[in-house]
Design a protein with these regions (language model features):
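Ligand-binding loop in jelly-roll beta-barrel domains
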Residues: 92, 98-119
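Short hydrophobic/aromatic-rich beta-strand segments that constitute the beta-sheet cores
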Residues: 61, 78, 112-114
Length: 119
């Protein structure tokens, strides 16, 4: 680790102005279309970290790179193509492997910290 670089960063998640509009989900299921926004902390050739939030709704999702998630707020359910169910509440930690496919159904707006590993 380079000791000349300050790796620390602080953000108040309550401050909605810190989040940038990232648009709507790609493959919505139903009429309620989820809107996403986020805050990028760092990104390089091997990883990306940040905060992400999403409003209520359901969609088909495809995780293209391994992703670690620590959910901070909200309630949702992920169901893989193989039928594995991941119920998410505040405090849930999940890892989605590269090429994970399934659905996401958000019941209450979620916020998460994420780290994507470009593999």
């Amino acid at each position: 680790m380079d000791t000349n670089v300050d790796y620390s960063y602080s953000i108040k998640l309550e401050d909605e102005n810190s989040f940038v509009d990232w648009g709507v989900v790609d493959s919505p299921l139903g009429e309620q279309i989820s809107k996403t926004s986020g805050f990028l902390i760092s990104k390089n050739k091997t990883q990306e970290t940040g905060y992400w939030q999403c409003t209520e709704g359901s969609w088909n999702c495809h995780v293209t790179n391994t992703e670690f998630c620590h959910f901070l707020e909200g309630e949702c359910t992920y169901v893989s193509e193989k039928g594995q169910v991941i119920k998410v509440n505040p405090g849930t930690v999940a890892v989605f492997p590269k090429d994970w496919k399934g659905t996401c159904s958000i019941k209450k707006k979620i916020k998460k910290y994420y780290c994507i590993i470009f593999d």
